[in-house]
Amino acid sequence: MTSTRKSVLTSSSTITVTTCLLLVGLAAAGYASEGGEGAHHVDTAKQMKDFAWRCLDFAVLLAIVVWALKKANVKGSLAERQSNIEKMLKEAVEAKEQAEKKFLEYNEKLEQANKEIEAMSAAMKQEGELEKVRIIAEAKAAAEKVKEQAQQAAHQEILKARIELRDEAARLAVEIAEKKIKENITKNDQDKLVGDYISKVVTLH
């Protein structure tokens, strides 16, 4: 849906710029032909009327440019991008919280395992020394394995969340940068068209 809206806005901006160019071209052609005739017929009333029509044409062109800028809905598009970034940040924070929650669960299991080891150690005091050492070693190895698995799982979850956040943030930053560049170019083109039109009006008078 976002890509479709972006295409519609781009097409609308292109059509608007093309229309403005056509209007400027037609106005310039009309002014050039009228300027040639004015060299042979000097009429103050006619010149004032011609000047009034040119001012009206300029006002119409300016209104079209303002309408096109409003139609593009630039602020709405940027607000939508910002909303998407905030949503991704929120999801990344939630993923991190889930990873930390799992890490705490693994720590609780580890503490429970340590308690069981202590209970086993107390029970084995009555058994032979060699057997006791062997069982304790196995229990410690199992506890270390659980701890290592818990740390790896939590680390992987956090790393995954960071990578997804970084990639999405980079992608959205590029899209926003491209959007801003396109908007600046469109605005400069429109400013140039208005400036050229004013220059032609001043030159003809």
Curated annotation (Swiss-Prot):
Membrane topology annotation: Single-pass membrane protein
Membrane-traversing stretches: 51-69
rRNA processing among keywords: no
Keyword terms: ATP synthesis, Cell inner membrane, Cell membrane, CF(0), Hydrogen ion transport, Ion transport, Membrane, Transmembrane, Transmembrane helix, Transport
InterPro entries, per the entry: ATP_synth_b/b'su_bac/chlpt
Entry coiled-coil feature ranges: none
Pfam families associated with the record: ATP-synt_B
First-listed, main subcellular location of the protein, grouped into a coarse class: membrane
GO molecular function, one term: proton-transporting ATP synthase activity, rotational mechanism
GO CC annotation terms, alphabetical: plasma membrane; proton-transporting ATP synthase complex
Signal peptide (from-to): none
Cellular compartments annotated: Cell inner membrane
Domain of life: Bacteria
Assembly description: F-type ATPases have 2 components, F(1) - the catalytic core - and F(0) - the membrane proton channel. F(1) has five subunits: alpha(3), beta(3), gamma(1), delta(1), epsilon(1). F(0) has three main subunits: a(1), b(2) and c(10-14). The alpha and beta chains form an alternating ring which encloses part of the gamma chain. F(1) is attached to F(0) by a central stalk formed by the gamma and epsilon chains, while a peripheral stalk is formed by the delta and b chains.
Protein function: F(1)F(0) ATP synthase produces ATP from ADP in the presence of a proton or sodium gradient. F-type ATPases consist of two structural domains, F(1) containing the extramembraneous catalytic core and F(0) containing the membrane proton channel, linked together by a central stalk and a peripheral stalk. During catalysis, ATP synthesis in the catalytic domain of F(1) is coupled via a rotary mechanism of the central stalk subunits to proton translocation. Component of the F(0) channel, it forms part of the peripheral stalk, linking F(1) to F(0).
Assigned protein family: Belongs to the ATPase B chain family.
Database matches in PANTHER family: ATP SYNTHASE SUBUNIT B, CHLOROPLASTIC
Protein name stated in the entry: ATP synthase subunit b
Gene: atpF
